[in-house]
Amino acid sequence: MNEIFDKEEWASRKQQDREAAYAMVDDTLKKMGTNGKAFQTYLDVQSKFERYSVSNALLVAAQKPEATDLGDANFWRGRGGYIRKGESGILLMEPGNSYTRKDGSKGVNIHIKRVFDISQTTLTPTKQPAVSQDTRLLLNAMVRYAPCKVDFRDELPDGQSALYSPQEKTVFVRRGQSMEDVFRGVAQELAHAYLDTGNYSRENNIFLAQCVGNILCQRNGIDGNSLAVSQLPQKYTEMEPKQLREYLKSIRTAANQISADMFRFLDAKSHGSRQRDDAR
């Protein structure tokens, strides 16, 4: 026997989900402002789900940070799986139609939906293959479309692996390091170049660049523990959640720009290799 659809009850549940999602975002931001581990958890999630907005990465970090593959019930049914009994799902925000406010500005309706990790379904999670790209190739990909020059030096101040100079628009790299050390250093310092929009202070953005470097290491299979966040600088602990969120957007944007540029290089490289193989 089919249940009668109760529109009011449905609307009430949707409103409860909306309020819960927005409260969760605010609570997670507040926690991240004083908890280095919580901040690193967010970076871990953003590294896995690069297409997710800051708000949705915050929601995943708050509800199921170990998630690896997310989709709604219809998505999993399409794969031949079903949601396990008792699983309530993960609240995410989904942009809807745009609208015009009374003051003439544009806005976007936000819908709240529930998604599920593959571990919450009857399907068996498949272990993702480890990134096996050559580190030198990854480095070439990272600097190929960089908005700055890259130069090498025998020594850098304080023995740093790499150093971005806003004045010279150059990332200087210290010679004599392992490829992994160079990757970590360049990933962090290259972030400065992507963040630099003029009158740039490297010192004021060291923490943001560290976060970008950590995300890039995770995405490319490089050990990024030396760039992990254990404690936030004081200025971030004193920020209002809304301001901290803007910094998270800057981190996400820079990390995704570098990742996109790397993909462009690696995809062209792979495409060229396939063409040469076909010609043989």
Residue spans for each PLM region:
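N-terminal accessory/interface modules of nucleic-acid-binding and processing proteins
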Residues: 1-280
